[in-house]
């Protein structure tokens, strides 16, 4: 299982790091873990064009998009004090907290650019959009909990 996570991490970092990388779209073959990894790697490598935010938006749950509004509002939300920590962060660690057939909750430890640690709960649920039926999407991300300075 750990080897699979390492392989997936290397694979997605390679995809996201490529300046001309095509956006990864929701697909039935992607797991809940794949979705959160795609999003976190994209946010870690966000650029001046906000490619990381755009990638993350693709995996926002369709029901949440109704609440957050269009991409422009989602982008503003990610630049808010609570979520900008995710933009160009130094590293992250993903741990499964709980799961059911249609929902996974992950604990995400993020080390910010300023080397401060934060903790988020990341909810991933099955959903449908016009291009993907029964795919995994992020349905919610908690406010961060400040875990203090890194050693």
Task: Give, region by region, the residue ranges found by the protein language model.
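Positively charged n-region of N-terminal signal peptides that target proteins for export
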Residues: 1-5
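Sec-dependent N-terminal signal peptides
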Residues: 6-15
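Sec/Tat signal peptide C-region and signal peptidase I cleavage site
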Residues: 17-21
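N-terminal low-complexity, Pro/Thr/Ser-rich intrinsically disordered segments
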Residues: 22-34
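Short, aromatic-enriched amphipathic alpha-helices that serve as compact interaction elements
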Residues: 31-47, 59
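Short solvent-exposed beta->alpha transition segments
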Residues: 50-101
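Exposed beta-sheet edge and beta->alpha loop/turn motif
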Residues: 97-151
């Amino acid at each position: 299982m750990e080897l699979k996570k390492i392989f997936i991490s290397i694979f997605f970092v390679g995809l996201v790091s490529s300046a001309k990388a095509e956006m990864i779209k929701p697909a039935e073959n992607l797991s809940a873990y794949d979705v959160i990894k795609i999003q976190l790697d994209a946010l870690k490598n966000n650029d001046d064009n906000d490619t990381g935010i755009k990638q993350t938006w693709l995996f926002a749950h369709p029901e949440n998009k109704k609440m957050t509004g269009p991409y422009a509002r989602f982008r503003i939300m990610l630049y808010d004090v609570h979520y900008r920590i995710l933009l160009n962060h130094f590293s992250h660690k993903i741990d499964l907290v709980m799961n059911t057939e249609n929902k996974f909750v992950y604990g995400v430890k993020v080390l910010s650019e300023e080397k401060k640690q934060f903790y988020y709960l990341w909810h991933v649920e099955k959903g449908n959009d016009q291009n993907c039926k029964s795919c995994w999407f992020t349905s919610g991300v908690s406010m961060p909990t400040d875990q203090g300075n890194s050693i």
